[in-house]
């Protein structure tokens, strides 16, 4: 990189100084070289714990590409298929409920591209959280969720879909024995270790929880089911948003999908498929499942004409992005998490960037003043 990344570092430092975010980690790499690894502020405001390389961050929905990678590893092994009917693996997901034949048409590819017609969360999402339901109850509820439109027609971001993907992994990798979610957790964590990720936890123990950054501005403060922070939430291991990871390991994971990286755990074909545009339909109209949308959905924003996705990863595809910048290549892929986490990479430049914070996205700090897009612009401007 011929330019300096000092301006990108200064941008994040300024957000800390201004009180925009309590703590942050910024990492940038190119090829095998880590160009920036900086930590600022506090990981836990109440305990005055500083953010350090040992901090475990709630990466929220960046968990989804991990689940997608686990599914693709099963495809590599001949256990699962992208385009077979979902009901072939999950027979509970059968029959139509006044939905025409839509349910029978849903495939794992639809789930991985958020084009299945399933809503963001189940109808019973809050009720289950309030009664401290186990993760298995969430998965069971997903089997009965409505398919709101013909699969492939529109984009509707769906945690339900990735929960079903994880269930497919658990049933296939577990050989039909034992609890599928246990098999999913083992398989996904083994895959991460094979990719070089050493400190990632679905079910952090008491010692590990001492290192977790406390997420501010969740909108659920003080509730015993608060996202990211509550003892209950940390016991769920949600495959769509429940991982706690050190920042360097997030960088390792996203970098694993760049060309030239070696992996025996996940084939080059699988990794390429995940970061290649598989679908780019328009957003579903705001009238579709408005009460079951993701917490970062903004109903005041007009629907997008194209929403490009790979398999588990969002692909910029030349469209505007809140976090992948204004001048990055169309092939850039990434994901963000509601906890205030961002990871993206540019295959053409061999570049990867990770910003982890502990202020929730739904406070809208990343999109105010286009903060995270500006950060990506600063990073891209430093390229040769």
Language-model regions, residue ranges each:
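Short, conserved catalytic-motif segment at the N-terminal edge
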Residues: 2-59, 95-96, 228, 364-365, ...
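Short loop/turn microsegments at loop-to-beta-strand junctions
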Residues: 22-24, 35, 331, 339-342
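Structured C-terminal helix/loop/strand segments within mature extracytoplasmic catalytic/sensor domains
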Residues: 334-384
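Short, positively charged
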Residues: 1-14, 320-326, 379-384
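Hydrophobic (often cysteine-bearing) scaffold residues that line and stabilize catalytic clefts
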Residues: 4, 8, 59, 63, ...
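Short, surface-exposed loop or secondary-structure junction motifs
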Residues: 40, 44, 97-330
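Residue-level signal for well-ordered, solvent-exposed loop/turn and beta-edge residues enriched
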Residues: 33-34, 79, 351
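Short active-site loop at a secondary-structure junction
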Residues: 17-27, 46-110, 148-160, 238-241
